[in-house]
Amino acid sequence: MSRCHVAISGFGQIGRAVAELLAGRRAHYRERYGVEVRLVGISRSRGARVDREGLRDPLAADAPLDASLTGEAFVSAARPDVLIEAGPTDYLSGGAALGYLRAALAAGAHGIAISKGALVLDYPGLRALADANGVQLKISGATSAALPTIDLLDYNAAGCEVRVMEGIFTATTNYVLDRMMAGIAFADALAEAQRAGMAEPDPRFDVEGWDTACKVCILANAGFGARLALDEIAREGIAPIEAGQLARWRADGLVPKLVGRIERRAGGERRVEASVRLATYEAAHPFAGIGAGMKAVRIETDAMGELVAIGRTSPLATAAAALKDFEHLLMLGVVGR
């Protein structure tokens, strides 16, 4: 039986969820693909653990870490066939994730990105590096996780032209807006989202529209062939919204949503435009019924018409999106030979 060695960089809540799901699906990988999948390395901010025969109890909190194994040194020691990058998002510099992905792709390992920063900063460069080394770069976990955004573009609508993609890509803002329309103050709604584990302790990344803008930037570049920088995307957040405005929306039967939009413009030079804006929808629109904690995406195509998908957010769903990418690699037969 062939083997596939997997390493995870970034071992917080999502990285640990990836490890748990991976362990639970090992028998499935053996039975369906004839591949023995082994988790050979995990990397945290304080160091890493590596065992080419497979880590025993990778979730052990008290296991010693080798502080010398970070970045390229970790990739060299683990020698993974697949690196799953699950570290924090740093959309200004790409953070440690950028170094891990570059090292893995350059070493001939497939990359599965969950954190967004590296992709926002240099998706074209990472894609070129993957192509040059004959490996795949998969990004489902970074583009609204369980919501099938990049898959809609790459697979479901591959036989036509996608003219518009728009979506409710950030569950935190959708939750807060939903609660505000129910009469809850912004600060209280945000505190609820934090207690539910949906919003970060510093939620500005979500409520100021940065999270949605990052996802839109990645999708525009990866799915529409654009070369947009994050600061080229017009961006709005969800605060402040006055009580009077909320009352007017209620009276008019409108529902507010923070929406990311990508549009392919026609003309002499076909171009892609992207934005994040606070929009309102009548009850008949698909987005109006997307409740608290949910996400949705809609595309307009030339041949298939309109397609809509809806999903829920959670660390487990994000981890599952990364394993969907991993399973696609197994389906392609590019790992475990």
Show the residue positions of the predicted features.
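ATP-dependent carboxylate/acyl-activation modules
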Residues: 286-337
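N-terminal glycine-/serine-/threonine-rich beta1-alpha1-beta2 phosphate-ribose binding loop
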Residues: 1-106
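Rossmann-like NAD(P)H-binding beta-loop-alpha module
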Residues: 131-199, 210
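Rossmann-fold NAD(P)-binding glycine/threonine-rich loop
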Residues: 89-106, 114-143, 147-154
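Substrate-binding/catalytic subdomain of NAD(P)-dependent oxidoreductase enzymes
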Residues: 179, 190-289, 294-296
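Conserved active-site and cofactor/substrate-binding residues in soluble primary-metabolism enzymes
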Residues: 9, 13, 17, 78, ...
